[in-house]
From Swiss-Prot:
Phosphorylated; on serines, threonines and tyrosines. Phosphorylation on Tyr-1133 in activated platelets affects head-tail interactions and cell spreading but has no effect on actin binding nor on localization to focal adhesion plaques. Acetylated; mainly by myristic acid but also by a small amount of palmitic acid. It is a peripheral membrane protein. Residues 857-887 are annotated as: Disordered. Its main location: membrane. This is Vinculin. Exhibits self-association properties. Part of a complex composed of THSD1, PTK2/FAK1, TLN1 and VCL. Interacts with APBB1IP and NRAP. Interacts with TLN1. Interacts with CTNNB1 and this interaction is necessary for its localization to the cell-cell junctions and for its function in regulating cell surface expression of E-cadherin. Interacts with SYNM. Interacts with SORBS1. Interacts with CTNNA1. Binds to ACTN4; this interaction triggers conformational changes. Interacts with FLII. (Microbial infection) Interacts via its globular head domain with the central portion of S.flexneri IcsA (also called VirG). One of its GO terms (biological process) is negative regulation of cell migration. Belongs to the vinculin/alpha-catenin family.
Length: 1134
């Protein structure tokens, strides 16, 4: 089957597929319509010449290459293309003598398919060889990185740096060229990110090696920390280069990276649990320990971390972990409540505390088992990939030694481990069956090679058979590992809400548990937010979480009993919708407040650490101060990371922003201990320039990463909400300052004033970023003016705070300080107002009745008509046109069967309302009667009805599962598009058109009444609509004043042309198989799967483009000539 992961392959296959599509249509015309097929001798001769040239170049490459895999894989592709070309030539010759020949038509279609498939195989084989060249360079760098461990002198370091530089430059150049060639945007981003990380780490590596050499040669303290820094950097660079190697080998987008992320998350959770277990048990053992102190918080954090692990598990394992967490949480609440009432030493309280302590041990064991199982499966999966890679080299070499057979046996052993851990017996048996077949084939091949017959045709055929079987085994084991994990919910809030909504609307549809997983993810985030809240706020959020949990369980129970469409289920679904909205709003409010607090000052702790590290050797308590500040810095970094993760999970960020936050949080967690180590080296080597430079390098890297994290967090939350939260926090700080002055507490006053200054500076930073992001001159000017005014109020407030702290009883100084504080509040309010200018009331208020004047004067009479003239007739109302089905233009080719069917569906659908919540039976006659009456009276149909049609293909009963994936994808896009009227909005009109066309393609692919021509033409029509969506989206982006939104829109819409081109090629491949009996089921299924995957990607990309275009249209230039009208079909306020 064709693959299109590079622009070169796509550009070659597209014209080939276009020509093949013409041959396919000719074949069908001869087969169905009985038409004579014209003379094809000349075009087939041209194809033959092109194929001969391609094969000649390929054979020359094979003769000169040292790549054994290329030598093995090229000959079968040559044979496939040459055979297909021979069939075409034979078909042309037979048709020349008999234009109606049936065998000739069969040769024509089989040869066409073979040309397309064989050309794809040749191009893919060439491309894989090019990838192996890049991988060899990457592996060379990996090997040289290990040499860093033996560099112990400055001379060796200089030599090492000189040797590493050219190789790194070559790798960077090759990766840059490769990423530009890739068609998968995700792969490009992954390669660029990993390569950028390697580049950033290179100076850190040199610095770490330099400080290690310096401390070792001078025999100073800090060698252990320097060694940790160096090893960390080497391991980090190696991991990124290994990730580059993995991505280079991908030919389709896969979500396989989740396994390593989940393993890493489980390990981190387990480490966190272990570190807090003693503190938690200490609190439980002490009946006099206060509720809410560090010990109780440790228990909450343990349950939180264990809950994260539970969410990563499936089936019984998941239920046990989450059930234990919930039970222990309730028991901890009871213990805390008893202690708050002074009954901590009572037998009931002591017994409960002991039960919680024992329960924590049980929970820890469950978490360890879950982590061990996932790690075992992941390790086996990765081991299989490496061993199969080595085995393929052995299979390609007829004279290979016995080590290749050992690699295959090793891969089979790892696959057996995965089979044993499978919960699904069918999957387990399927893997075990494959193991037996591969083992037998490998033994037979090894015997032939031991007999010196490794180069015989039989041995070569066996080698190819084993290679294919190993690839199939890898696919099966990968699927088994993926199926052992729970359904993955979206990574961002809106995605989870959408998944949850789809399940709530259709609880009886099997969505593989995605909808419920999304709801569980939202509830889990709610619990995490509640853990850092106190008092009634915490109880309120937990109550909302429990309410959503209960309603979800009740709805799922009804659906399981087949009552998902009952009145009770519909009532539950409505309640669950409302509860989810409440939970979402409360979570976002809590998260915004936390971001406002935690991110008000990100760099002071690291600056204080730097001061402690550079303290003079004779400074008092030098070591103790350093340890305290290092602990504060680590704690602060942890808070930043945890809060950023909550912003990613609960904020309004898109997928790329969420992934960016997660990456920066991971980097911060890795860098923090390295910064502390670098600071400790500097502390123990005062005055050492190399130690100082190394610490500065590590510190700057940490600060740069946190600044990036802060920017992404600001993107993830609503700016206006953040400013509101910051303003409220400043008011509270000012109230604390009043209390401090009243109680004569200067330190409390200074703390409050410092907090006010930090929050004000944070607001300035947010405003500065928004000004840089915008190209709207009025907005920039307004925000800049408000920011300048705020900036001028901070220093006077700080000076007034210092003055009043020195003489806190002076009423005059107190008044000056409070006046300064209120000026800051006023300036903050102006910044906030600049982000949300006052809009006129909607609807406008009624006029003042007192201003109305009623008189008895009659209106002047109409002037009489000229004598003898008759009044002209009333002009007819404007003709109502169906935007989805524009009139055919002269010379335009339209897929007639599909369009006729679509028009019939459209006419039928006009009889029914598409407004939600109105049963068809209630509106059928009334709506039609009203519409007919309006038409008869000469009045236009009301605007509400102007584009209320839903093609029947997209109106499947919502209570029935959609088993056709292409149709499901079309419905998903259609649901998104029908939120808006398409009057005056060409993007919405094109999106609806695409949804209809894709629904038609679903019918054609399923073997409906359509033809090969219809399938090919449908794909072309979809591509045409895709081009229109892309063009319009780029126009919107060009006029958008928000740089961030513009970039998002362009990134989404740039995927569409590539995917639509691939759809045309795949449709041609599928068309060559329709009605053919000599195609294997496996080959036909593979073609269908690729077409389905492509269609889903296209629908998703258009859906995202519609959303981003709507967001971009809000920030359109005021002088833009290009506008789109965004009018909701169902207004948000109804």
């Amino acid at each position: 089957m064709p693959v299109f992961h590079t622009r070169t392959i796509e550009s070659i296959l597209e014209p080939v597929a276009q020509q093949i599509s013409h041959l396919v249509i000719m074949h069908e015309e001869g087969e169905v319509d009985g038409k004579a097929i014209p003379d094809l001798t000349a075009p087939v001769a041209a194809v033959q010449a092109a194929v001969s040239n391609l094969v000649r170049v390929g054979k020359e490459t094979v003769q000169t290459t040292e790549d054994q895999i290329l030598k093995r894989d090229m000959p079968p592709a040559f044979i496939k293309v040459e055979n297909a070309c021979t069939k075409l030539v034979q078909a042309a010759q037979m048709l020349q003598s008999d234009p109606y020949s049936v065998p000739a038509r069969d040769y024509l279609i089989d040869g066409s398919r073979g040309i397309l498939s064989g050309t794809s195989d040749l191009l893919l084989t060439f491309d894989e060889a090019e990838v192996r060249k890049i991988i060899r360079v990457c592996k060379g760098i990996l090997e040289y990185l290990t040499v860093a461990e033996v560099v112990e002198t400055m001379e060796d370091l200089v030599t090492y740096t000189k040797n590493l530089g050219p190789g790194m430059t070559k790798m960077a150049k090759m990766i840059d060229e490769r990423q530009q060639e890739l068609t998968h945007q995700e792969h490009r981003v992954m390669l660029v990110n990993s390569m950028n990380t390697v580049k950033e780490l290179l100076p850190v590596l040199i610095s770490a090696m330099k400080i290690f050499v310096t401390t070792k040669n001078s025999k100073n303290q800090g060698i252990e920390e320097a060694l940790k820094n160096r090893n960390f950097t080497v391991e980090k660079m190696s991991a990124e280069i290994n990730e580059i190697i993995r991505v280079l080998q991908l030919t389709s987008w896969d979500e396989d990276a989740w396994a390593s992320k989940d393993t890493e998350a489980m390990k981190r959770a387990l480490a966190s649990i272990d570190s807090k277990l003693n503190q938690a048990k200490g609190w439980l053992r002490d009946p006099s320990a206060s509720p809410g102190d560090a010990g109780e918080q440790a228990i909450r954090q343990i349950l939180d971390e264990a809950g994260k692990v539970g969410e990563l598990c499936a089936g019984k394992e998941r239920r046990e972990i989450l059930g234990t967490c919930k039970m222990l949480g309730q028991m901890t609440d009871q213990v805390a409540d008893l202690r708050a009432r002074g009954q901590g030493s009572s037998p009931v309280a002591m017994q409960k505390a002991q039960q919680v302590s024992q329960g924590l041990d049980v929970l820890t064991a469950k978490v360890e088992n879950a982590a061990r199982k996932l790690e075992a499966m992941t390790n086996s999966k990765q081991s299989i990939a490496k061993k199969i890679d080595a085995a393929q080299n052995w299979l390609a070499d007829p004279n290979g030694g016995p080590e290749g057979e050992e690699q295959i046996r090793g891969a089979l052993a790892e696959a057996r481990k995965i089979a044993e851990l499978c919960d699904d017996p069918k999957e387990r048996d399927d893997i075990l069956r494959s193991l037996g077949e591969i083992s037998a084939l490998t033994s037979k091949l090894a015997d032939l090679r031991r007999q010196g017959k490794g180069d015989s045709p039989e041995a070569r055929a066996l080698a190819k058979q084993v290679a294919t079987a190993l690839q199939n085994l890898q696919t099966k084991t990968n699927r088994a590992v993926a199926n052992s994990r729970p359904a993955k919910a979206a990574v961002h809030l809106e995605g989870k809400i959408e998944q949850a909504q789809r399940w709530i609307d259709n609880p009886t549809v099997d969505d593989r548990g995605v909808g419920q997983a999304a709801i569980r993810g939202l509830v889990a985030e709610g619990h995490r937010l509640a853990n850092v809240m106190m008092g009634p706020y915490r109880q309120d959020l937990l109550a909302k979480c429990d309410r959503v949990d209960q309603l979800t369980a009740q709805l799922a129970d009804l659906a399981a009993r087949g009552e998902g469409e009952s009145p009770q289920a519909r009532a539950l679904a409505s309640q669950l919708q409302d509860s989810l909205k409440d939970l979402k709003a409360r979570m976002q409010e809590a998260m915004t407040q936390e971001v406002s607090d935690v991110f008000s000052d990100t760099t002071t702790p690291i600056k204080l650490l730097a001061v402690a590290a550079t303290a003079p050797p004779d400074a008092p308590n030098r070591e103790e101060v350093f340890d305290e500040r290092a602990a504060n810095f680590e704690n602060h970094s942890g808070k930043l990371g945890a809060t950023a993760e909550k912003a990613a999970a609960v904020g309004t960020a898109n997928k790329s922003t969420v992934e960016g936050i997660q990456a920066s949080v991971k980097t911060a967690r890795e860098l923090t201990p390295q910064v502390v180590s670098a600071a400790r080296i500097l502390l123990r080597n005062p005055g050492n320039q190399a130690a100082y430079e190394h610490f500065e390098t590590m510190k700057n890297q940490w600060i740069d990463n946190v600044e990036k994290m802060t920017g992404l967090v600001d993107e993830a939350i609503d700016t206006k909400s953040l400013l509101d939260a910051s303003e409220e926090a400043i008011k509270k700080d000012l109230d604390k300052c009043k209390v401090a002055m009243a109680n004569i507490q200067p330190q409390m006053l200074v703390a409050g004033a410092t907090s006010i200054a930090r929050r004000a500076n944070r607001i300035l930073l947010v405003a500065k970023r928004e000004v840089e992001n915008s190209e709207d001159p009025k907005f920039r000017e307004a925000v800049k003016a408000a920011s300048d005014e705020l900036s001028k109020t901070i220093s006077p407030m700080v000076m007034d705070a210092k003055a009043v702290a020195g003489n806190i009883s002076d009423p005059g100084l107190q008044k000056s300080f409070l006046d300064s504080g209120y000026r800051i509040l006023g300036a903050v309010a102006k910044v906030r107002e600049a982000f949300q200018p006052q809009e006129p009331d909607f609807p406008p208020p009624p006029p003042d009745l007192e201003q109305l004047r009623l008189t008895d004067e009659l209106a002047p009479p109409k002037p009489p008509l000229p004598e003898g003239e008759v009044p002209p007739p009333r002009p007819p109302p404007p003709e109502e046109k169906d935007e989805e089905f524009p009139e055919q233009k002269a010379g335009e080719v339209i897929n007639q069967p599909m369009m006729m069917a679509a028009r019939q569906l459209h006419d039928e659908a006009r009889k029914w309302s598409s407004k939600p919540g109105i049963p068809a039976a209630e509106v059928g006659i009334g709506v039609v009667a009203e519409a007919d009456a309006a038409d008869a009276a000469g009045f236009p149909v009301p605007p509400d009805m102007e584009d209320d049609y839903e093609p029947e293909l997209l109106l499947m009963p919502s209570n029935q599962p959609v088993n056709q994936p292409i149709l499901a994808a079309a419905q998903s896009l259609h649901r998104e598009a029908t939120k808006w009227s398409s009057k005056g909005n060409d993007i919405i009109a094109a999106a609806k058109r695409m949804a209809l066309l894709m629904a038609e393609m679903s019918r054609l692919v399923r073997g409906g009444s359509g033809t090969k021509r219809a399938l090919i033409q449908c794909a072309k029509d979809i591509a045409k609509a895709s081009d229109e969506v892309t063009r319009l989206a780029k126009e919107v982006a060009k006029q958008c004043t928000d740089k961030r939104i513009r970039t998002n829109l362009l990134q989404v819409c740039e995927r569409i042309p590539t995917i639509s081109t691939q759809l045309k090629i795949l449709s041609t491949v599928k068309a060559t198989m329709l009605g053919r009996t000599n195609i294997s089921d496996e080959e036909s299924e593979q073609a269908t799967e690729m077409l389905v995957h492509n269609a889903q990607n296209l629908m998703q990309s258009v859906k995202e483009t519609v959303r981003e275009a709507e967001a971009a249209s809000i920030k359109i230039r005021t002088d833009a000539g290009f506008t789109l009208r965004w009018v909701r079909k169902t207004p948000w306020y109804q």
